[in-house]
Each structure stands twice: as structure tokens, then as C-alpha cells.
Swiss-Prot record:
Mg(2+) binds at D13, G40. IMP binds at D13, E14, G15, K16, N38, A39, G40, H41, T132, R146, Q226, T241, R305. Keywords: Cytoplasm, GTP-binding, Ligase, Magnesium, Metal-binding, Nucleotide-binding, Purine biosynthesis. Binds 1 Mg(2+) ion per subunit. The gene is purA. It is an enzyme of class 6 (ligase). Plays an important role in the de novo pathway of purine nucleotide biosynthesis. Catalyzes the first committed step in the biosynthesis of AMP from IMP. The keyword Secreted does not apply. It comes from Rhizobium meliloti (strain 1021) (Ensifer meliloti). It holds the Pfam family Adenylsucc_synt. This is Adenylosuccinate synthetase.
């Protein structure tokens, strides 16, 4: 038995929700370890859809403990709204099934406002990143700047005013420079006071809790958000998120040692998508790109934004396999490729007349790199709902085997529809 870390191996939206749901049924604890409510997914359980952005997937399953680790930035208003929405669907979220790290950073209204102000200014200058405007980046900035308000601060009203003053010294200077009105000390105190009573019962010392449960033999599932190519260090900077999204962050963002992580499962879409700005070597602006978007229902769970679509990029996923130490992948949305006459896979790039096997870190070089493709025959048969290799067309199996060879990692699970049971299990990550 081992613990499992789930990470996205592309630019997010790989289908982590279904796979995490499938795995969470067998886990005892599900841990979020980075990001915020800027990425979401939909779980379908007994025909009921649950849309989650901040809460770990385990929260909708009876008998599971959901944990929000110290690596997550938490908007308390979004947290409570999500809890209330689940309550309306008959799911009770209580301190019995949800624990939140006492040292996790809070996202406040001033973070959301700053995020929006910056994006508006960047849109006018052509330097937009394409954030969700939810305050994630500004909150991480305050965390690194050692001026953040953390969950534990809600319980210490004696020292909170001085911390708010320190926070506002920074933010009001920024706002003056941007031509925006300053924020009053009382406004932030009122905002924090309005959520403290409901948030504090969930607070816990997470590293201690997880260490205790690990020693008892609990199965722990670490649930990543976004994808490797959006990692602040390893992604297509600056068109990235504001946290580390790679598997190593599961340790740092939860307070557990790296030796506790176990099986690293990379969720990998059978083609490539991206939301927002940034380089995308295999992007298709043609009829095939539109086909992938429509067949794959490529719209964001949180923002509703249309996703850009393109061919599978084995060179990028190969990089993700290395950066995460991926043990095996879950290949999703294979069924979306049904009916295409031929399929292309990117195996590298040409840059300045030279062929290279990885995407450089340089923004200018990323923009100039051109994909090098191999072409495979497609298949006309349907793979929708396939639950065994015998249900798959020969060409679909050939495509999967080619992906494995090119990325240097085996397929552990294969998903053939949004339904959780339409999954071909090759290797059980918890038993590896």
C-alpha cells in the first residue's frame, strides 16, 4: 500500500476530477496542497454533479477526511460559499470531514481587487497573463513577503490589528501608485471578523494530523490543481500560475516529507488544451481544433472560458514526467479522438534551424519553436465507455502505446468517457 499524488502533466484541465474521484473512493484522506479556487472540476456521484474549486474531492464522500494544506491560499468567502452550496445538495461539510491548515494564507478582497486592476492594465498594454482575477497571485505575493494574514490569525484578535496595518502599508502604497482609493483598516478587520466564527472550527495543525494518520496506515491521496506546465518554476513563465504545481509541492504544501508521497500519477489528456495566454506549439486554429473543443466540451469549470486545443505534445509531457518523477499516467479523453482520419503527435521542435527534443525556458524561444510531428492512422470505431483493452480498436491501442514510448512512462489508467466507471485499470496506484 502506498500514498498517491495526482498532478496534471499539461496546462491543467486534463480530467483530474474524474480520476481523483475514482481514487478518493479508496483513500482515507484527500489533501489539497497548492493553488486556490482558481481551478475547478466536476464530480458525478450517483448521477449528482458537484462542482468543486477549493474543497478537496473527498469531502463529498462519506467517511473520508478532506484536508486543505498550508500550500493552498484560501478565500474564506469562496470556502464558505462552496460549503453552503454543497449543503444545499445534501452534503454536510463539518470539522469531522474537513480540516484546514492553521498556517494557510487567506485571500482577501484587496487581493481580488488588485488582481483585476493589474489584469485590466495589462490588457491595455498587451501583456495580459490571463488570470482568473480571484486574487491567487497577490495572496501568494503577500505570503512570500511575510505580510500575509493566515488562518490562525483569525483566532488571535490581540495581534491581528498590527498584522492588518502591516498588510495595508504595502497594499495602500500599491493602490496609490495605481490611482486607486486606499483601503481602511476597519474594512479589513470587518471582513476578517465576518468569517472567523465559521472558519476557525475547521482549523488544525495539518502536518501533525497527517503524520499521525500516516503512522496508523491511512491511505492518503494528494490532489493537485492546474498542471505542470503552469508551475511557477517549470511552466511557460510568465504565463503560469503563482504556485508550484509539481509533485514535490505535495510534501511542502502539506507538511509531510517527500518519502511519504509514494506513487506519482500524471493526469494526461490524449490531446492538448490550454486556457488563457501563453505559448502553445501544437495549437490548432482549424476545423480539427474546433472538433476537439466541441467534442471534448472544452470550457473551464470555474471561468467558463473556451480552451485552446491542439495535438498531443509528447515532448512537453516527457518534461512533466521528469519534473514530477511520474510513475505512471492516467490517459484521459481518448474517446474525443474517435473518427479522425489521422492523428499527429509532437515529438520535438525546430528552433533556429536546429531540431530540439524539449521546449526551452526562454519566452522568446518558446514563441519561435515549431512542432515536429509524427502521424498515426486514426480509427472510426467508438471508444466511448470502453472498460477493457479488448473494447478498444487496434489503432487506438497503437496510439496509446506510442504515447507511452514517447513520454517514457506507462499508462496506469485509461479514461474513455466522463463517467467514473468508464476506466480501464492497468496498474492500481495504491497497490504499486
Amino acid at each position: 500500500m502506498t500514498n498517491v499524488v495526482v498532478v496534471g502533466s499539461q496546462w491543467g484541465d486534463e480530467g483530474k476530477g474524474k480520476i481523483v474521484d475514482w481514487l478518493s473512493e479508496r483513500a482515507d484522506i484527500v489533501v489539497r496542497f497548492q493553488g486556490g479556487h482558481n481551478a475547478g472540476h466536476t464530480l458525478v456521484i450517483d448521477g449528482v454533479s458537484y462542482k468543486l474549486s477549493l474543497l478537496p474531492s473527498g469531502v463529498v464522500r462519506p467517511g473520508k477526511l478532506a484536508v486543505i494544506g498550508n500550500g493552498v491560499v484560501i478565500d474564506p468567502h469562496a470556502l464558505l460559499a462552496e460549503i453552503d452550496k454543497l449543503a444545499a445538495q445534501g452534503v454536510k461539510v463539518t470539522p469531522e470531514n474537513l480540516r484546514i491548515a492553521d498556517n494557510a494564507t487567506l485571500i482577501l478582497s484587496l487581493h481580488r481587487e488588485l488582481d483585476g486592476i493589474r489584469e485590466d492594465a495589462a490588457s491595455n498594454s498587451g501583456t495580459k497573463i490571463g488570470t482568473t482575477r480571484r486574487g491567487i497571485g497577490p495572496a501568494y505575493e503577500d505570503k512570500v513577503g511575510r505580510r500575509a494574514i493566515r488562518v490562525m490569525d483569525l483566532a488571535d484578535l490581540d495581534t491581528l490589528p498590527a498584522k492588518v496595518d502591516r498588510l495595508l502599508t504595502h497594499h495602500n502604497a500599491l493602490r496609490r501608485g495605481l490611482g486607486e482609493a486606499e483601503i481602511s483598516h476597519q474594512a479589513i478587520m470587518d471582513e476578517l471578523s465576518s468569517v472567523a466564527e465559521r472558519v476557525l472550527p475547521f482549523m488544525d495543525t495539518i502536518w501533525l494530523l497527517l503524520d499521525r494518520e500516516r503512522r496508523k496506515g491511512a491511505r492518503i491521496l494528494f490532489e493537485g490543481a492546474q498542471g505542470t506546465l503552469l508551475d511557477i518554476d517549470h511552466g511557460t513563465y510568465p504565463f503560469v500560475t503563482s504556485s508550484n504545481t509539481v509533485a514535490g509541492q505535495a510534501a511542502a504544501g502539506s507538511g509531510m516529507g517527500p518519502g511519504s508521497l509514494g506513487y506519482i500519477l500524471g493526469i494526461t489528456k490524449a490531446y492538448t488544451t490550454r486556457v488563457g495566454e501563453g505559448p502553445f506549439p501544437t495549437e490548432l486554429d482549424d476545423e480539427i481544433g474546433r472538433f476537439l473543443g466541441e467534442r471534448g466540451h472544452e470550457f473551464g469549470t470555474v471561468t467558463g472560458r473556451k480552451r485552446r486545443c491542439g495535438w498531443f505534445d509528447a515532448a512537453l509531457v516527457r518534461q512533466s514526467v521528469a519534473a514530477n518523477g511520474i510513475t505512471g499516467i492516467a490517459l484521459t479523453k481518448l474517446d474525443v479522438l474517435d473518427g479522425l482520419d489521422e492523428l499527429k503527435i509532437c515529438v520535438g521542435y525546430t528552433l533556429d534551424g536546429q531540431q530540439i527534443d524539449h521546449l526551452p525556458a526562454s519566452q522568446a524561444q518558446q514563441a519561435s519553436a515549431k512542432p515536429v510531428y509524427i502521424t498515426l492512422e486514426g480509427w472510426k470505431e467508438s471508444t466511448v465507455g470502453a472498460r477493457s483493452w479488448a473494447d478498444l480498436p487496434a489503432q487506438a491501442i497503437k496510439y496509446v502505446r506510442q504515447v507511452e514510448e514517447l513520454i517514457g512512462a506507462p499508462v496506469a489508467l485509461l479514461s474513455t468517457s466522463p463517467e467514473r466507471d468508464d476506466t480501464i485499470l492497468v496498474t492500481d496506484p495504491f497497490e504499486d
